[in-house]
Amino acid sequence: MYKQIFLCLIIAALCATIMAEASAFADADEDDDKRYVRGMASKAGAIAGKIAKVALKALGRRDS
């Protein structure tokens, strides 16, 4: 079960990293949108990390 959770977190981190990378051919008008998306992706990643920590703590308390 922990392997599945770990795999899910790794995939989420990789997706967030890929989404946060800016492309080299972006127009000046699109830069603002990309910055907004990058900010949202990093916030989503932080929230997902906090949820994962809470879930792992809850699972740890349940097992012991």
Swiss-Prot record:
Name the UniProt record assigns to this protein: PYLa/PGLa A
- The signal peptide here is 1-20
Q: Which UniProt keywords apply?
A: Amidation, Amphibian defense peptide, Antibiotic, Antimicrobial, Cleavage on pair of basic residues, Cytolysis, Fungicide, Hemolysis, Secreted, Signal
Residue ranges spanning the membrane: these are: none
Recorded GO cellular component terms are: extracellular region
Cell compartments where the protein resides: Secreted
Superkingdom in the source lineage: Eukaryota
- Organism field: Xenopus laevis (African clawed frog)
GO terms in the biological process aspect are: defense response to bacterium; defense response to fungus; killing of cells of another organism
Q: What does this protein do?
A: PGLa and PGLa-H display a broad-spectrum of antibacterial activity against a range of Gram-positive and Gram-negative bacteria. PGLa also displays antifungal activity against C.albicans ATCC 14053. PGLa-H shows moderate antibacterial activity against the multidrug-resistant methicillin-resistant S.aureus (MRSA) but exhibits very little hemolytic activity.
Organism taxonomic ancestry: Eukaryota, Metazoa, Chordata, Craniata, Vertebrata
What tissues is it present in? Expressed by the skin glands. Synthesized in the stomach and stored in a novel granular multinucleated cell in the gastric mucosa. Stored as active, processed peptides in large granules within the granular gland secretions of the skin.
Point out residues bearing the modification Leucine amide: L59
Please give the family membership noted in the entry.
Answer: Belongs to the gastrin/cholecystokinin family. Magainin subfamily.
Positions of the pro-segment in this chain: 21-35, 60-64
